[in-house]
């Protein structure tokens, strides 16, 4: 069973490690989303795999006519909707049609870049790890943090960060233009 205080691996490696198509796809996703290594991609795939497995099990239990299946399905769909992975009013089939990009788009690193707080996806990662970004008033230093739909608009520079000042040279030009400062 293992020691409960020890962290355990949260991902699975691919079964065929040298498959050319998969490797090319992984490299493209790593570049697009600014991931540090393939392990981060595999963690996101594990999250996706978990929700797909739950979706398949719930569809099977609904087909058998189990009473709790509807309640559990609503809970899973509600959770994925809160994170913005699914749209409101989605059904169990939508869980099975999720893609890895749906998970990667909800990462804090991607959200910081998409909102224009950083010039590049790599700079977004650096801002987060150096503690320059806050979500809902709390400093977050984990680029893989999954941002909830309600917290999207609360992503900003941390108040104690030098980047919070208007004239900082590393601030994105999009933000300077949006706040009314000079570019």
Swiss-Prot record:
GO BP annotations listed: ribosomal small subunit biogenesis; translation
Any Pfam family hit: Ribosomal_S4
Keywords associated with the record: Ribonucleoprotein, Ribosomal protein, RNA-binding, rRNA-binding
Entry superkingdom: Archaea
Entry keyword Protease: no
GO cellular component, one term: small ribosomal subunit
Domain S4 RNA-binding: start-end pairs: 106-168
Keyword Ribosomal protein found: yes
Xref: CDD domains: S4
Gene Ontology molecular function, alphabetical: rRNA binding; structural constituent of ribosome
Classification via SMART domains: Ribosomal_S4, S4
Description of how the protein assembles with itself and partners: Part of the 30S ribosomal subunit. Contacts protein S5. The interaction surface between S4 and S5 is involved in control of translational fidelity.
Record-stated family: Belongs to the universal ribosomal protein uS4 family.
Function, in words: One of the primary rRNA binding proteins, it binds directly to 16S rRNA where it nucleates assembly of the body of the 30S subunit. With S5 and S12 plays an important role in translational accuracy.
Alphabetized NCBIfam families for the sequence: PRK04051.1, uS4_arch
Protein name, as recorded: Small ribosomal subunit protein uS4
Classification lineage: Archaea, Methanobacteriati, Methanobacteriota, Stenosarchaea group, Methanomicrobia
UniProt gene name: rps4
């Amino acid at each position: 069973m293992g020691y409960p205080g020890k962290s355990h691996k949260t991902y699975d490696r691919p079964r065929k490690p040298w498959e050319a198509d998969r490797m090319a796809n992984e490299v493209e996703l790593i570049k697009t989303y600014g991931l540090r290594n393939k392990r981060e991609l595999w963690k996101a795939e594990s999250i996706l795999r978990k929700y797909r497995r739950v979706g398949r099990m719930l569809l099977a239990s609904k087909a058998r006519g189990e009473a709790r299946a509807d309640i559990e399905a609503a809970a899973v769909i509600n959770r994925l909707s809160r994170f913005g992975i699914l749209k409101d009013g989605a059904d169990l089939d939508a869980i099975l049609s999720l893609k890895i990009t749906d998970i990667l788009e909800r990462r804090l690193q991607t959200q910081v870049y998409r909102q224009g707080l950083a010039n590049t996806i790599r700079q977004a990662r650096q801002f987060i790890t150096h503690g320059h970004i806050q979500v809902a008033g709390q400093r977050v230093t984990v680029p893989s943090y999954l941002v909830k739909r309600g917290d999207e608009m609360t992503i900003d520079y941390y108040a104690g960060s030098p980047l919070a000042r208007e004239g900082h040279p590393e601030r994105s030009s999009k933000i300077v233009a949006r706040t009314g400062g000079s570019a």
